[in-house]
């Protein structure tokens, strides 16, 4: 009891310190980008969320857009088979909230930003909603949220779970903390065997762990719509043009690609730059200007009829817009401090996939993509040659598309396995 109390107090102190360290950056985003204005009351517990109706309640949580989006087939199936349940979906980012509202409010879900995980804030919210099941997407588990839910009798599951090498080392160093942090989870449904070994390394029993594969490979027909013609028309790309979509770009990715793009003087090669964070738009623009690349901004009505390069300064369109690509590159993979983003989205939109050397967040998936030749791993030295070859050889591009489709087909049973495990837990609960 004393140990748990001490752990809770130390955790609170850590969160408070982290907040003050991040405060200048937070206030900068508030005053210059208008972020967090709509969500601060919920975040700080000033305003409590309310869930309508009666019946058992399942609370889903994901860090941001990607983690929340992968819940779509799960919520749809849950609603079909267990219509008496109520849904809550939370996320830590405003972009995630917008995505969750678009996807889930029509299903009757209550969506809001997750309050801060300080014991004095989150515990009262958990007590008010009293969830019967809590489901964390991928790995964004919060200690007080989890432990208070368990104290009230909820079941807690991690789905599509993963644990990075960095996090594993950190929790291994503090093995007792790692065990205490994840031990309240009833089940951990993980992406692969490597993540299983990492969780076991920090003290989680193998009896709690299931490996089902990556749920992001699952495509429901409603989510797999390919809008290639729609986006190419909207971007004003002709049938002779070749489009490279550079998604989730960070400044270091831009630096590498700017050098390559400067070699393309052919007006039929179009480049769409999609920043990961819109607040870094000016930095991206300066890097392109420095490289002598002329570009337009989507928000200002620019199109590929006027420019060979466009910056897509709009949120929430990247996955859809991959469908217009002749080549797709996933950013964050030329920045060792980032380690990559979702490698599957281009495949789901039937675009040839490329990524850089830094893929810590999905290293196992990246290795399997390379083995199946469903994705191309490039570095600074090979990037220009690989891109040039793909642009000039339609057969090669089509071969990567077909291998990507085959890869997804082989992996798509991961959702069904995950659902069957969860369903067995739901049906045996006494609500």
Swiss-Prot record:
One of its GO terms (biological process) is lipopolysaccharide core region biosynthetic process. It is found in: Cell inner membrane. One of its GO terms (cellular component) is plasma membrane. Gene3D superfamilies: 3-Deoxy-D-manno-octulosonic-acid transferase, N-terminal domain, Glycogen Phosphorylase B. InterPro entries: Glycos_transf_N, Glycos_transf_N_sf, Kdotransferase. The active site is at residue 67. The chain crosses the membrane at residues 5-27. It comes from the Bacteria. It is a single-pass membrane protein. Pfam families: Glycos_transf_N (PF04413). Belongs to the glycosyltransferase group 1 family. Glycosyltransferase 30 subfamily. This is 3-deoxy-D-manno-octulosonic acid transferase.
């Amino acid at each position: 009891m004393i140990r748990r109390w001490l752990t809770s107090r130390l955790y609170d102190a850590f969160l408070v310190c982290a907040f003050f360290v991040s405060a200048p950056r937070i206030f900068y985003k508030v005053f210059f980008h208008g972020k967090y204005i709509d969500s601060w009351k919920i975040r700080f517990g000033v305003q409590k969320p309310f869930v309508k109706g009666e019946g058992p309640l399942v609370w889903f949580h994901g860090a941001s857009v990607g983690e929340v989006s992968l819940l779509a087939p799960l919520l749809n199936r849950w609603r079909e088979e267990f219509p008496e349940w109520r849904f809550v979906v939370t996320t830590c980012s405003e972009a995630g909230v917008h995505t969750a509202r678009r996807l889930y409010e029509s299903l009757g879900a209550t969506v809001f930003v997750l309050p801060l995980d300080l014991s004095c804030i989150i515990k009262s919210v958990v007590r008010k909603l009293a969830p019967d099941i809590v489901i964390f997407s991928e790995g964004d588990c919060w200690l007080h949220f989890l432990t208070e839910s368990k104290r009230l009798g909820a079941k807690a599951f991690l789905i599509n779970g993963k644990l990075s090498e960095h996090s594993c080392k950190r929790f291994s160093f503090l093995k007792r903390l790692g065990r205490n942090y994840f031990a309240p989870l009833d089940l951990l449904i993980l992406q692969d065997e490597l993540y299983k070994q990492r969780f076991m390394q920090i003290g989680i029993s193998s009896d709690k762990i299931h490996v089902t594969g990556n749920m992001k490979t699952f495509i429901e027909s409603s989510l797999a719509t390919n809008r290639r013609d729609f986006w190419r028309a909207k971007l004003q790309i002709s049938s002779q043009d070749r489009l490279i979509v550079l998604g989730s770009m960070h400044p270091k990715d831009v630096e590498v690609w700017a050098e390559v793009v400067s070699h393309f003087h052919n007006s039929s090669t179009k480049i769409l730059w999609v920043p990961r964070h819109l607040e870094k738009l000016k930095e991206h623009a300066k890097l392109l200007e420095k490289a002598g690349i002329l570009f337009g901004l989507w928000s200002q009505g620019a199109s590929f009829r006027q420019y060979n390069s466009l910056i897509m300064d709009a949120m929430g369109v990247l996955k859809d817009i991959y469908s217009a690509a002749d080549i797709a590159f996933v950013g964050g993979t030329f920045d060792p401090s980032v380690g990559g983003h979702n490698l599957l989205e281009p495949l789901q939109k039937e675009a040839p996939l490329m990524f850089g050397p830094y893929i810590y967040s999905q290293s196992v998936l990246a290795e399997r993509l390379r083995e199946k030749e469903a994705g191309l791993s490039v570095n600074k030295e090979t990037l220009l040659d690989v891109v040039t070859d793909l642009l000039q050889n339609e057969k090669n591009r089509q071969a990567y598309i077909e291998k990507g489709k085959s890869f997804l087909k082989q992996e798509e049973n991961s959702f069904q396995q995950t659902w069957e495990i969860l369903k067995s837990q739901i049906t045996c609960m006494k609500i």
